[in-house]
């Protein structure tokens, strides 16, 4: 073809230039009508378009808008070319169809052209026919409708008449059967029962504060298994249990058992008020009614209100705990008002319960508000309450719910633990571990499960010792500390204020010896929470085992002696394993396996991290009650105190080997515990408020490291070695809560070094102590190094040097440089930490120099803290007087950071308005304290290192 073109073929011969349409016109066959021309101006195209569309659709088998519009466009021309239209349509319609289509279309156009209206005659005829048909159809339809309507009316009338007759004949029967309806009566009875349950729970929650007896009753129902616990736990859990039971009971009420339990529980409220500690009646009733229900109710109320509110909303209700914390501030006085021995137990239970969940007063006074949250938690717990078998579900539910609400558990773990401890002193240790661990497992199960068992054991020892004011006060203080730390971090202002207020008065009442015990107990609780947290955070498995161990051992050792127990408590985490076996009964209720789940739950680590810090402070408070105050003051820039407080507890661990030193430190630490506890209350609340507010995320992230570090370090040397560096890594951020603010990443490496060095140093220091004490002492040293590194990271290497970790000090120092402001505060804290370390390590290291430094720090910090904390001292005057000697170190250390932040922290909880006013002063004080702390750090570094 192309070649021909180039050869000289003509355009006609070349198909490229040929007129194809002409060829097509020649080739195609057209209808005869197409030869006629149509004037489209005379045609009503709108009438024809529907026909075209219909016809094209019939030909193509589907509606093709392109073809239809193409035809319309061609017809819009005044004189369309029919043949060209057919040629153009052959591409869309095949030749045959195109010819047929044009053969039909053109006649229509021609007829429309002739018609005046421009409508084809065919259409007119069709329309006429259609109209006729429509009329006929309409007539038919009308007649049919009339007939149908008549029939329907007749049918309806007949049906209505028959129905009326039937109804008339049946109505008397129905009315008779319905009116008597015993169902209604039974339902009203049930409703009344439910109401009585729900009301009684409400009334109980309302009457919790006035009457712990209902709580005791409910506790007594729970007592059946932990009857031993029941006395103290009945008191403590009375508040928490009454809250929980009240909230849960409305839910369990549907069960017939529940109504009777409620009635019984109401009766028991009155009876158990006198009985409150009479376990047999409450046990028999509880057991006969449903121990699982009643105890689950306790747990549910304490847990549901404390745990469930915090666990389930855990993150969410951490703020809510803050909300509750203001009421907590209010509750503490009522707790004291309510007979401190039982009241304290109740306070502990309620304080730990309501303290953990805005406990005693918040649970009591707020019990109604908490009821809904606890009720929310109680529904799952209903199942737990419903039957002992349900209690394992509770454990299971708690593991699941704890993951969410562990915060609640954090706050209430101690109280509940104390309640459970007292309730099931025999079996509660597992129950505590399982129950609290299960409950706290989400966060507090891991964090506070250990504290929970420990508090229970503490309560066991307390219940064994007194079940009375001292242990109750210690439990309440511990619980308050726990929930302070929890609330301080969750609601550090109000939580810390209420907790610090409660703890301070209790401490002032308890004072040195009792303050030491209570602090030790509370430290054991708080420490135990942190160990468990550490254990939990260290590894779910390790945490589980160690939690069980630590709670029991701690409780047993607590029983052995208030002062040694702190160290033993830390030791106890590993020794605790023997006691945990007895707790399995509580585990039965809580499902021993589920508690591990709760403990194991790695999800809670988030909560762990938040509550771990809280618990690590609680640990500090609990562990360091006697010696830790120094470390508390030393490492405890309030958050650091919590972080550093683990280091004081490590001192106990370390000082286990030198118990006498522990005791002497305990004396000083007892003094300082009140101060340190005050600082923890105030400054740690303050920082917990500050850092819990700003660093809470950090606390959750980095605190989890610390609590883990404390857990890992305190429970086993293996964890120490394995997790000590992890703790170092993680604790760097915890240890440098200030540093966390400054920088977290550098610290992990540094803290690893410090943790390793501190592990080595601690092992050296704690060579004499047992493996547990070594692991705890060694891990405490990492913890102390870490927490001290928190303070040291803040305060520099003086304390690491004191601990014989020159390498750690440098990392910590590098950390402290990262936290420039915090190093100054830690410097003083380091001073106090070095002193605090000195009691445990004075024998190992430069105790004299550190003690002198402690005295100096105490002097400086006393003046500073007295100036800064005049308000706090007024509030804490009684407690401060007791730890006045140790107070300088604890207060000075706390004053460095906590005095700086404690004015803000303690005033914030107690006097937020004052704390706001004091914040400006605190900033200046913090600057001065930081400067002095830096100076003291330098001195401490020189002397300890030398």
Swiss-Prot record:
Residues 426-436, 724-736, 833-842 have a biased composition (Polar residues). Residues 171-207, 274-327, 334-349, 555-572, 586-611, 640-655, 668-682, 850-875 have a biased composition (Basic residues). Residues 142-946 are annotated as: Disordered. Residues 1-156 are annotated as: Necessary for mRNA 3'-end cleavage and cytoplasmic accumulation. GO terms for cellular component: nuclear matrix; nuclear speck; spliceosomal complex. There is a cross-link at residue 231 (Glycyl lysine isopeptide (Lys-Gly) (interchain with G-Cter in SUMO1)). There is a cross-link at residues 127, 231, 249, 445, 457, 470 (Glycyl lysine isopeptide (Lys-Gly) (interchain with G-Cter in SUMO2)). Residues 1-151 are annotated as: Necessary for DNA and RNA-binding. The modification N-acetylmethionine is found at residue 1. The modification Phosphoserine is found at residues 220, 227, 234, 240, 260, 387, 389, 391, 400, 412, 418, 427, 429, 434, 448, 450, 461, 463, 476, 522, 524, 526, 528, 530, 561, 563, 572, 574, 602, 616, 624, 626, 635, 645, 647, 655, 657, 713-714, 723, 725, 731, 733, 779, 781, 789, 793, 795, 797, 810, 814, 816, 818, 822, 832, 836, 838, 843, 915, 943. Identified in the spliceosome C complex. Found in a pre-mRNA splicing complex with SFRS4, SFRS5, SNRP70, SNRPA1, SRRM1 and SRRM2. Component of the minor spliceosome, which splices U12-type introns. Found in a pre-mRNA exonic splicing enhancer (ESE) complex with SNRP70, SNRPA1, SRRM1 and TRA2B/SFRS10. Found in a mRNA splicing-dependent exon junction complex (EJC) with DEK, PRPF8, NCBP1, RBM8A, RNPS1, SRRM1 and ALYREF/THOC4. Interacts with DDX39B, CPSF1, RBM8A, RNPS1, and ALYREF/THOC4. Seems to be a compound of RNA export complexes that are released from speckles in a ATP-dependent manner. This is Serine/arginine repetitive matrix protein 1. It comes from Mus musculus (Mouse). The gene is Srrm1.
């Amino acid at each position: 073809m192309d070649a021909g073109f180039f050869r000289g073929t003509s355009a006609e011969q070349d198909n490229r230039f040929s007129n194809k349409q002409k060829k097509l016109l020649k080739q195609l066959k057209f209808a005869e009508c197409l030869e006629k021309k149509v004037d489209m101006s005379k045609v009503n195209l709108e009438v024809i378009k529907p026909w075209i569309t219909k016809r094209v659709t019939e030909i193509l088998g589907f509606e093709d808008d392109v073809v239809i519009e193409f035809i319309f466009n061609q017809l819009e021309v005044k004189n369309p070319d029919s043949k060209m239209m057919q040629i153009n349509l052959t591409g869309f319609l095949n030749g045959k169809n195109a010819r047929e289509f044009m053969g039909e279309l053109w006649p229509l156009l021609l007829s429309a052209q002739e018609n005046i209206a421009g409508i084809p005659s065919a259409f007119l005829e069709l329309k006429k026919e259609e109209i006729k048909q429509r009329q006929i159809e309409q007539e038919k339809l009308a007649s049919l409708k009339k007939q149908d309507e008549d029939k329907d009316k007749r049918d309806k009338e007949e049906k209505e008449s028959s129905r009326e007759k039937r109804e008339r004949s049946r109505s008397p029967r129905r009315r008779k059967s319905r009116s008597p309806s015993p169902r209604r009566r039974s339902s009203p009875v049930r409703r009344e029962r439910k109401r009585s349950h729900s009301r009684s729970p409400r009334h109980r929650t309302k009457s919790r504060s006035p009457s712990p007896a209902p709580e005791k009753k409910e506790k007594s129902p729970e007592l059946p298994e932990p009857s031993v616990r029941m006395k103290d736990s009945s008191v403590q859990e009375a508040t928490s249990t009454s809250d929980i039971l009240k909230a849960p009971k409305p839910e369990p009420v549907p069960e017939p058992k529940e109504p009777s339990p409620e009635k019984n529980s109401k009766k028991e409220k009155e009876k158990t008020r006198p009985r409150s500690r009479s376990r047999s009646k409450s046990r028999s009733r509880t057991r006969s009614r449903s121990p699982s229900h009643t105890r689950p109710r306790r747990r549910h109320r304490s847990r549901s209100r404390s745990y469930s509110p915090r666990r389930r909303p855990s993150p969410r209700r951490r703020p809510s705990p803050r909300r509750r914390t203001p009421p907590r501030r209010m509750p503490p006085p009522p707790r004291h008002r309510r007979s401190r021995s039982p009241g304290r137990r109740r306070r502990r239970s309620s304080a730990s319960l309501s303290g953990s969940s805005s406990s005693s007063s918040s649970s009591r006074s707020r019990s109604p508000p908490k009821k809904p949250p606890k009720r929310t938690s109680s529904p799952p717990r209903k199942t737990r309450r419903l039957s002992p078998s349900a209690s394992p579900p509770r454990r299971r539910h708690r593991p699941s719910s704890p993951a969410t609400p562990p915060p609640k558990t954090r706050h209430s773990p101690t109280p509940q633990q104390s309640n459970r401890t007292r309730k099931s002193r025999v079996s509660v240790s597992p129950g505590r571990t399982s129950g609290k661990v299960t409950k706290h497992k989400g966060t507090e199960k891991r964090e506070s499960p250990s504290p929970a068992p420990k508090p229970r054991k503490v309560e066991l020892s307390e219940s064994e010792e007194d079940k009375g004011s001292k242990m109750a006060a210690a439990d309440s203080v511990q619980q308050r500390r726990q929930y302070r730390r929890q609330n301080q971090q969750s609601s550090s202002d109000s939580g810390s204020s209420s907790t610090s207020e409660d703890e301070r008065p209790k401490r002032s009442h308890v004072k040195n010896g009792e303050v030491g015990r209570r602090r030790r107990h509370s430290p054991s609780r708080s420490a135990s929470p942190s160990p468990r947290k550490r254990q939990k955070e260290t590894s779910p498995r390790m945490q589980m085992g160690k939690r069980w161990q630590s709670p029991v051992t701690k409780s047993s050792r607590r029983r052995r002696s208030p002062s040694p127990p702190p160290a033993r408590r830390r030791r106890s985490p590993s020794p605790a394993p023997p006691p945990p076996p007895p707790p399995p009964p509580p585990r039965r209720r809580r499902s021993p396996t589920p508690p591990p789940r709760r403990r194991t739950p790695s999800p809670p680590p988030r909560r762990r991290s938040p509550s771990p810090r809280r618990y690590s402070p609680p640990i500090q408070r609990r562990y360091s009650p006697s010696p830790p105050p120094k470390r508390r003051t030393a490492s405890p820039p309030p958050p650091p105190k919590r972080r550093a407080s683990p280091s004081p507890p490590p001192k106990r661990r370390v000082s286990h080997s030198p118990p006498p030193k522990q005791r002497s430190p305990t004396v000083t630490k007892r003094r300082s515990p009140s101060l340190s506890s005050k600082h923890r209350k105030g400054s740690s609340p303050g920082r917990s408020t500050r850092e819990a507010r700003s660093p809470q995320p950090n606390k959750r992230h980095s605190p989890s490291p610390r609590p883990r570090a404390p857990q890992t370090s305190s429970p086993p040397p293996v964890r120490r070695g394995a997790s000590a560096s992890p703790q170092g890594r993680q604790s760097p951020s915890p240890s440098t809560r200030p540093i966390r603010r400054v920088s977290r990443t550098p610290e992990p490496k540094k803290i690893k070094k410090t943790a390793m060095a501190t592990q080595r140093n601690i092992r050296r220091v704690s060579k004499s102590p047992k493996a547990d004490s070594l692991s705890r002492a060694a891990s405490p040293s990492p913890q102390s190094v870490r927490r001290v590194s928190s303070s040291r990271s803040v305060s520099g290497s003086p304390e690491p040097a004191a601990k014989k970790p020159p390498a750690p000090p440098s990392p910590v120092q590098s950390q402290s440089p990262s936290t420039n402001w915090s190093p100054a505060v830690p410097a003083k804290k380091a001073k106090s930490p070095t002193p605090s370390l000195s009691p445990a390590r004075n024998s190992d290291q430069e105790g004299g120099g550190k003690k002198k430094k402690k005295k100096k720090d105490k002097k400086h910090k006393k003046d500073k803290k007295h100036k800064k904390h005049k308000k706090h001292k007024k509030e804490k005057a009684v407690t401060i007087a007791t730890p006045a000697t140790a107070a300088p170190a604890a207060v000075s250390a706390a004053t460095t950071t906590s005095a700086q932040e404690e004015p803000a922290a303690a005033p914030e909880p107690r006097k937020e308005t004052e704390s706001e006013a004091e914040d400006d002063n605190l900033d200046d004080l913090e600057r001065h304290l930081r400067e002095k702390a830096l100076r003291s750090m330098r001195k401490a570094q020189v002397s300890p290192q030398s």
